[in-house]
């Protein structure tokens, strides 16, 4: 006979009067007047088990049961007495009268209660196996599974083929640092773990597989930010003979399908499309959160000749910018609030935060309250009020600096105010889901330290057709056929049309100061393949971890990954990374150099 006939959480009134065999863990044990109640838990939920003292041997076993004991229960399903049902449980109308109780494995006392919502992340990750038993973690990982299923369903229906690409590959040090794997059989040589399957999926297009996908692990040895992992999972896709618009339409439909089928959310029938330049101008970010209703107003040209040097200096600097955000009803904010926001923007490099409270627009400058108004001439004041659309009771915040500092600091302030209690109370943020595409990214960014251009996306992204000439004459003007899908302020997917002609790829390498010899050494296999009739192709990669985090409403991507790393790229459960013994190092022809002692 099978050890289990039903899952605990699926025992309902349909099984009334039937004998069942259940397996699971003790969530709670209660002794009520000589009758023992056990909440037995498995992955499907809870069921209440009643242990009556009439069965002496079974009852004695039940008396010794404690939380997290692993049990097998045999008994009969019966209705709960009137007034004791639990509407929160699928099994809440029934209970199981226990006839036989077998302790499959006892448990030592857990280091925490599974229903404790105030556990530190260190505790949770150190005892991850127990943490994963908690209902929320069970829910999150099953949601992740369902997302993966729906992705596969959609892509299979669209003719995509799941093809695995190598985990041990060639190091191509462009972008983030690679994780290196020493080769024992080739002393002094190393594999790299892939940052993405980028080049292999392009080669698959050249090889006539037409449509490829893979749900794949990727690795980046980068300085970890708040919500990054050294290993992460991509929904990686590539397709041939489609235009940029067709690629976006195809994968927009995939995301709509996944959201509808997994969490019942209907996303916009057509996602809005925004140029990168517009996103930076209006929101200071290439991943704008469209739920927040605040926008930038550019004032650079209006304050070039004011006496206020904080404004006029960046306004007359090549890469300077002066911008503002108007906060409706922001006049209610206290000086303490303003000081707090001032300290907040300093995190992003701003030197301070100028502001004007608009008490009465009709009175002109006399209706404004601010320490900076006296340093602004009438034309500048008029431009500020008119361009921002300021009304009585508003406040206007300003940032003036290099464009990057303005965008970063004012963009962060926009989100902070929008999502604050003040913002919610005053309708500055909407609920729900706000997807969009951001397109036409710069092809290159200039690296001041290395004194050269670097690829803004990656060096295999195609320039826009009309910008091909700029590759050799003015790379800064060159825009790429690149696109990001943004949802509620997070980039959830990014891709591009790829370069499919060898001569164009070589021009891009030259623009990046990668000479022909270096290009052949690093990417010769790609350049060779492009000469064999490579088709036009493009693709996209979605961050599975990020998508599931948003769907689950989780605080961190670590809450949707079974065994994540910490911000220091450590696994607290297994204590990885760890030292290895000298013999292993000798086999790999590696000698460790001890770090220099600190002075």
Swiss-Prot record:
Name one cellular component (GO) term: cytoplasm
- Region feature (Aspartate): 198-201
- Detail the disulphide connectivity of this chain as listed in its UniProt entry: none
Annotated EC: 6.1.1.23
Tell me where on the tree of life, at the top rank, the source sits: Bacteria
Could you confirm whether the keyword Cytoplasm appears in this record? yes
Residue numbers for the site described as Important for tRNA non-discrimination?
32, 83
Top EC group:
ligase
Give residues annotated as binding ATP: 220-222, 229, 491, 543-546
Q: Has the keyword Repeat been applied to this entry? A: no
The alphabetized UniProt keywords are:
Aminoacyl-tRNA synthetase, ATP-binding, Cytoplasm, Ligase, Nucleotide-binding, Protein biosynthesis
- Record field: transmembrane: none
Q: What does this protein do?
A: Aspartyl-tRNA synthetase with relaxed tRNA specificity since it is able to aspartylate not only its cognate tRNA(Asp) but also tRNA(Asn). Reaction proceeds in two steps: L-aspartate is first activated by ATP to form Asp-AMP and then transferred to the acceptor end of tRNA(Asp/Asn).
Q: Record's NCBIfam families?
A: aspS_bact, PRK00476.1
Assembly and interaction partners? Homodimer.
Q: What is this protein called?
A: Aspartate--tRNA(Asp/Asn) ligase
Question: Which source organism?
Answer: Paraburkholderia xenovorans (strain LB400)
Q: Which gene encodes it?
A: aspS
